[in-house]
């Protein structure tokens, strides 16, 4: 969602976040390291270099949807997300975890376990959680591209509004 798949560059929620930060006069620079189609494994593989180069104060972890859409083992996704969180904390960064939901293609047990995974990670890692990035978006067909997976540019202000209340205390201190 964060890589602006299928929408014009600069219209996604991360670009809107940078503008909101600027409008609120916070001295914060946003680095969007998202790659469209990325899995937790891919994110973890790139993360050590990124965290060492960028030295972030806050890391937003928004990964896992592609693992779920591919039916990958949730134990692997969970382990990878925990690793990213732990590496972030070791580098001195605060962490915000973004939860997702997936279509019921793999059955209710997998779908329910997928949602529960984010809650478990947030609880055990003691990090704040945005329970569902697409709250207020997922139930509106007009907010989705033809693939019915990726939001249109019109949905991204709502996506930012879902993240902002949890992120604001982390960047305003």
Put a short name on every predicted segment.
Residues 1-6:
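Short glycine-rich His-centered loop
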Residues 8, 35-38, 72, 151:
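Short, surface-exposed alpha-helical recognition segments that flank or form part
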Residues 9-10, 110:
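Single-residue recognition of alpha-helix boundary sites
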Residues 16-26, 42-173:
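Alpha-helical cap/lid subdomain in secreted, periplasmic
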Residues 26-39:
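A short beta-strand-loop structural module common to alpha/beta enzyme folds
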């Amino acid at each position: 969602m964060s890589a602006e798949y299928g929408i014009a560059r600069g219209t996604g929620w991360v670009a809107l976040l940078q503008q909101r930060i600027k409008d609120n006069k916070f001295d914060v620079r946003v680095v969007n390291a998202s790659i469209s189609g990325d899995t937790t494994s891919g994110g973890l593989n790139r993360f050590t270099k990124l965290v060492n180069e960028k030295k972030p104060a806050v890391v937003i972890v928004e990964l896992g949807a592609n693992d779920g859409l591919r039916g990958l083992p949730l134990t692997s996704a969970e382990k990878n997300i925990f690793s990213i969180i732990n590496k972030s904390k070791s580098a001195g960064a605060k962490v915000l975890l973004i939860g997702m939901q997936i279509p019921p293609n793999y059955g209710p047990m997998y779908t329910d376990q997928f949602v529960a995974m984010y809650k478990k990670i947030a609880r055990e890692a003691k990090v704040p959680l945005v329970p569902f990035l697409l709250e207020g978006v997922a139930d509106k067909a007009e907010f989705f591209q033809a693939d019915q997976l990726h939001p249109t540019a019109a949905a991204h202000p709502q996506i930012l509004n879902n993240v902002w209340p949890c992120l604001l205390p982390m960047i305003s201190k």
